[in-house]
Every structure is written in structure tokens, then in C-alpha cells.
């Protein structure tokens, strides 16, 4: 007696899990607390809590995760018996479109100092950025929207800005951009993704 028909019935995919849209990048001094869970998606709560919004970007924010590994091999097996992680690079990259001195400092390592001179007699007001190669650590967070329309937050407690920066001064080709590369310098166990899934019950 023949068996049951052989069927091909793949599981259903969830189209609403396919996400798109911008991520908002905030930076802060190391140790700055995140907003309360209730306010993770509220931009003003970040700013009032000591975080700085980097502003407009050229092509959004990118997350780059690159582990380096070492294969453990034995003669009796063609594939590795284990793959050991030797180091990990986690970077948040973007190109800043808003040319403020704070953003220039962030792109150039976040080690500079800003001083403000008030206007006075024969003295125009000015702000001076003095750069430094003593790069300073900072915290960063990327806030996006999840499939429920709530906030999803990548929190990296300690990063350093240490990437190459090339800014073109052109008459009309494009805006002046300041590329930023924020490299995680904290243990991976300190990095977290927070996903809001439901409103509070009261």
C-alpha cells in the first residue's frame, strides 16, 4: 500500500519582522544612564538625560560586527571540531552632515576641548576647538523602531572614535561630511539590545 504523499510545506514567514528605517545615534560621557524604559523612544528624554544627538547623517548609521576566529582541527576530521573567537570588532559608523564643532571633535577622536569667548569691546564672540590625539572614551546608543513600533536600543557603554576622516570642501558637489567610526572598547557582555514589547499595565 503506498505511503502518504510527500508534501513540501515550508513554515510561514513573518513579513512584519522585515524592518527598515533610520537609526538615531546618541553619545554621552561614559557612565551616563539610559532613559527609563518608558522613555527609550522619546528623543527629548535622551537629550535631557545627558545624551547628545549627533544630528543629520549622509546615509544613516551602520553597525559592523566582525569576529576573528581560530579553528581547532584534528587529523581525523576535515571540518574543525571547534571555532574559538580570538577577538571581536564592533563598530558603529556614520557620516555626520551637521558641521558643528562638537561633531568635528567627535569625528577627530573626541579628545579636543571647546572654549567659548563672549563678545565684548573689540572682541567678537567665538568658540574655539583645540584638537588632541588623546582620544576620550564615550558611550553611545543607536535607537531604532522594532516590528511593534516601539523602540529597540543598541547600548554600547564604552566606545572610542578612532577612524579615518576625509571632508571635501566643494563648491556644489555635496555637503561637507565628517565620517565617524565608534569602536566598542567594553566587554561584549556589557553591550545590550533592549526591545520594548508591551506598554506598562498601569
Q: Locations of the language-model features?
A:
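Mixed-charge, glycine-accented linear interaction segment located at domain edges/termini
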Residues: 150-202
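Short helix-loop boundary/capping segments
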Residues: 101-157
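Exposed beta-sheet edge/beta-hairpin loop segments within beta-rich domains
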Residues: 81-85, 129-133, 166-176
Amino acid at each position: 500500500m503506498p505511503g502518504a504523499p510527500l508534501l513540501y510545506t515550508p513554515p510561514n514567514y513573518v513579513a512584519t519582522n522585515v524592518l527598515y528605517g533610520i537609526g538615531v545615534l546618541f553619545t554621552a560621557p561614559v557612565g551616563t544612564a539610559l532613559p527609563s524604559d518608558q522613555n527609550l523612544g522619546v528623543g527629548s528624554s535622551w537629550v535631557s538625560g545627558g545624551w547628545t544627538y549627533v544630528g543629520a547623517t549622509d546615509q544613516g548609521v551602520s553597525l559592523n560586527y566582525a569576529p576573528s576566529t581560530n579553528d581547532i582541527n584534528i587529523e581525523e576530521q576535515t571540518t574543525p571540531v571547534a571555532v574559538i573567537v580570538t577577538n571581536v570588532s564592533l563598530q558603529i559608523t556614520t557620516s555626520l552632515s551637521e558641521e558643528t564643532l562638537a561633531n568635528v571633535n567627535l569625528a577627530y577622536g573626541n579628545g579636543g576641548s571647546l572654549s567659548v569667548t563672549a563678545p565684548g569691546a573689540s572682541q567678537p564672540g567665538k568658540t574655539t576647538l583645540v584638537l588632541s590625539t588623546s582620544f576620550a572614551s564615550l558611550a553611545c546608543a543607536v535607537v531604532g523602531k522594532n516590528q511593534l513600533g516601539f523602540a529597540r536600543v543598541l547600548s554600547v557603554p564604552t566606545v572610542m572614535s578612532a577612524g579615518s576622516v576625509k571632508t571635501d570642501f566643494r563648491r556644489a558637489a555635496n555637503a561637507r561630511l565628517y565620517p565617524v567610526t565608534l569602536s566598542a572598547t567594553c566587554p561584549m557582555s556589557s553591550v545590550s539590545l533592549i526591545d520594548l514589547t508591551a506598554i506598562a499595565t498601569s
